[in-house]
Regions:
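A short, N-terminal "cap"/entry segment at the start of jelly-roll beta-barrel domains
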Residues: 1-35, 68, 84, 102, ...
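N-terminal targeting signals for Sec/Tat export/insertion, comprising classic cleavable signal peptides
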Residues: 22-54
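Short acidic-glycine-tyrosine-enriched beta hairpin
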Residues: 26-31, 40-42, 71-88
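Extracellular/periplasmic catalytic domains that process cell-envelope and extracellular macromolecules
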Residues: 30-31, 51, 59, 76, ...
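Conserved hydrophobic/aromatic beta-strand scaffold that supports enzyme active sites
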Residues: 36-38, 57, 82-84, 107
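Histidine-centered metal-chelating micro-motifs
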Residues: 46-48, 66, 83-96
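Glycine- and acidic-residue-biased ligand/ion/polar-headgroup-sensing regions
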Residues: 52-71, 79-81
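Ligand-binding loop in jelly-roll beta-barrel domains
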Residues: 74, 88-115
Length: 139
């Protein structure tokens, strides 16, 4: 399944569990597709600086996560709270707020069909390479 290989390896937090939930072409939005995943960050886990070039909607299920986009304020999200990341945002902080408990959240992405989920961050903004875990099989 392409979605499973798409989620197989990434710059997502070390030891994070990534579970694909669904991928769907969006007929009412030509050239766009939706992708939904769950992530479980182990205690103390964090993500490197990244971007999605997509609309990303985050919803926390368990634990707490700290999020920030470049130019924005760092916020701590608890279960039931959400976070939005726009297509031009650079996600500078993405970490489990706890060093003792895991954090679980859902991410729903609205992106260009076939586009990389985690493309390289602009080298003038930050240094990050494309993610093989979420990008395998995509051009």
């Amino acid at each position: 399944m392409l979605l499973a290989s798409l989620i197989a390896s990434t710059l997502i937090a070390q030891d994070a569990q990534v579970t694909p939930l669904m991928s769907k072409d969006l007929a009412d939005f030509p050239g766009k597709e939706g992708l939904m995943i769950t992530l479980v960050y182990p205690p103390g886990s964090s993500d490197p600086v990244h971007r999605h070039n997509a609309h990303a909607f985050v919803y926390v299920l368990e634990g707490s996560v700290v999020m920030q986009v470049k130019g924005g304020k760092e916020i701590t999200l608890m279960p039931g709270q959400s976070f939005y990341e726009g297509p031009n945002d650079i996600h500078t902080v993405d970490r489990n707020a706890s060093t003792t408990k895991p954090a679980k959240f859902i991410v729903a992405l609205l992106k260009d069909k076939g586009a990389l989920v985690l493309p390289p961050v602009n080298p003038t903004s930050a240094s990050v390479s494309a993610s093989p875990k979420l990008n395998s099989g995509k051009k």
